[in-house]
Amino acid sequence: MKPPPLQRTIAVFAMGLCLIITNAGNARTQNTLPADTSSTSSFKNAVVFLDKLEKLEPSPYWPNIQPALFLQNLKTNIRQPLSPYQGRGTNFCGYGAFTYLLLKDDPLGYVQLLLQLYQKGRAEYAGIMFNPSNRVKVAAGNLKFKGILDIRPAEQMWYLCLADHFKGYLNIFNRQYDPGDEDLFWASVNYAKFNRMLQKMLHFKVQAKGGDIIRPHTGDLFGYITQKLATGQVILFINNRLVHKKDHTKLKLGVPTHFIVLDEITKTGNTITLTYWDYGGKTLMQLTPAFLKKIIFGITHCTKKEPDAS
């Protein structure tokens, strides 16, 4: 039996705070790169590959996934790479942002990975073996009342597999999936876990500043983000409850809960304009420098890994 939500929240964040303080001296990290130095694919590669697939047979591993919807979901994400959507009320935000970056990095690899998972019940990518639990396999395709995610079984499968495989301190007391856990700590993504996913699976150099409680120290925040965006991808870890006055998450504390992938940042007078990916599309937000500083807890900078010249 799981402990009551309030007790679980207090226990998890007490432990999380200890872990964060222990690592506070290493707020800026440069992660080790994956061993694979091959070039990544293009959207054209993925489209050509998918166009050869007219239909899929039902999978014996995923009883609640409809083959036609699964294939359509893959084609939608390749033809409309902004479309990955984490679902209403879930804790899949980090996995949605990660998937958007994976699609930009290796779209063909994404398609082949999800097809292998669907057809064989397990799959390997970047040296990582995904072998989801039977509970996850039953849940995929059966999530309801999550908005358009309801009819996107490939994304349901993928987000559940990511949550099942990657664990952080927020997942300590809830490691095994039960129905409804997509909305709870089982699916949560803390900042270090998100960066670890990028490090292990994508062809990126990853630098990170900040944390789940400790804000990044950058001096001129606008200048720092502008500089990083000029040389690579920038992901911001923000307190979305300050931006949107609504119950976006089950987490009721004043902490960051949301990952956005920045597309553009400009400044006119005392107004900063952000354009970024989240929730399956592009969003524009205007705010003051003080409010920007208030909502940002993490800044992740990703640059494409260069192929080995040898």
Positions of predicted regions on the chain:
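Acidic, glycine-rich loop-and-strand cores that form catalytic or ligand-binding grooves
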Residues: 197-209
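Non-catalytic membrane-recruitment/adaptor modules and adjacent regulatory linkers
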Residues: 148-195, 216, 234-240, 254, ...
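Active-site nucleophile-adjacent alpha helix/oxyanion-hole segment immediately C-terminal to the catalytic cysteine
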Residues: 39-174, 228-235
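Bacterial Sec-dependent N-terminal signal peptides
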Residues: 1-30
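Active-site-adjacent substructure of cysteine-protease-like catalytic cores
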Residues: 209-271
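Cys-His-centered catalytic/binding microenvironment captured across papain-like cysteine peptidases
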Residues: 250-257, 266-310
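Solvent-exposed loop/turn segments at secondary-structure junctions
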Residues: 93, 100, 240-243, 282
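Short N-terminal segments immediately surrounding and downstream of signal-peptide cleavage
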Residues: 28-44
